[in-house]
Every structure is written in structure tokens, then in C-alpha cells.
Amino acid sequence: GLTVVYENIAEDDPNKIAFLSNGKRPLWVSRNGERIQVVFPKGTVVMDKVLLHENESSRRRFTLGHEGAHSVIAKQNPMQDVGCFHNEFDPERVYTIKEQKELMSFSETQADRLSSVFLMPRFILRKVMKKYKCENGLPVYGWNVFAPEDKLKLRKMADCMGVSFQALVIRLKTLGLLMPRDLTVYLENDLQLGGAK
């Protein structure tokens, strides 16, 4: 099994909120006002203390699932047995090419998907979608834009399952339950930004 500890993670990138240790790579943490490097035993999941807040339970669950997924994947593929960070995507931030590659890497995508499977098995997700009358899926405009009423449904569904909005969207995409639509359809019809007709 994995050991879970909470620390004040003090890496240079503030979006690093969790770390699965391989027993070799040091992690910057803040203890007693001092920034130090610590090598945690292999199989230790280090979570940032911010995730202990009550309003962070969905993020905490997804992040634990994400790090657990890295552990499962590493057992199947020893080449991936490296210290792994869970980075939160910040839409307000400008990322370097290197940071983008790290965020969108195959191993991170695998861990996100596996975490969403742990938290939202298909049969549970189907029941929740039926409850919210969207069992055939929901339209998504462009990369990730939802009509306000669909966004509200997604938030209610995420709350019902104890997951974040982002985790639910990842799972729905994986299962092909988001129906892609051109963003211009939303802009012209729903927001009525298409000008006079």
C-alpha cells in the first residue's frame, strides 16, 4: 500500500500539489518557516496541506486517485517508476513548452484517466447521468465550453459523486459522453453573438 502524508510543498511551481516518491528524488517542503529538501520513502504520497481544507475534498480525492494511479502504472511499467508530481492546470498562467509537455504527458494523462475510473465507475456515472436527464451525453463547444444549463448539471453531478467538475469532464470525455460542437454554434446561437440574421 501507499503511505499518505501532508506537507507544505515548496517547489518552485506552485501548481505542484502532490508527489509520489520513488525514494530517490528530493521534494522541497516548508517546515517551521524553512525551505528544505526531503527524500520520502518509496511509495509515499506527499499531499500539500491546502488539500486538507474541507472545501478541497473533491480535489483531494482526485489527487489521491491520481497518485494511486501512478503507483499502479509503475507496477505495470517499471520505466515509469520515477517521482511523479500532480500539477493543477492554471488557465491564468502562461506555460513554457517544457511545462506544457509535462502537464500533457502520456503518464499524466493516464493517471488522470485512471483516477477518474476509480472515482466514477461507468455504472455509477450512468445512474447519475440518468438522474440528471443527460444519459445520452452533453454537448461541449470547442475544447471545453458548456452552455450554462449544462454546466449547472455537470456541477450538480460532480457534487453528487464527490468529485471535481474537472474530474467529471475528464471521465465523460474518456467515455465519449461529450458531444463535440463547433464553438461558433454556441457563440452565434446561445450567446447570440452572430450579428443580425
Task: Tell what function each PLM region has.
Residues G1-K197:
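Active-site hotspot residues in diverse enzymes, especially metal/ion-binding acidic/histidine motifs
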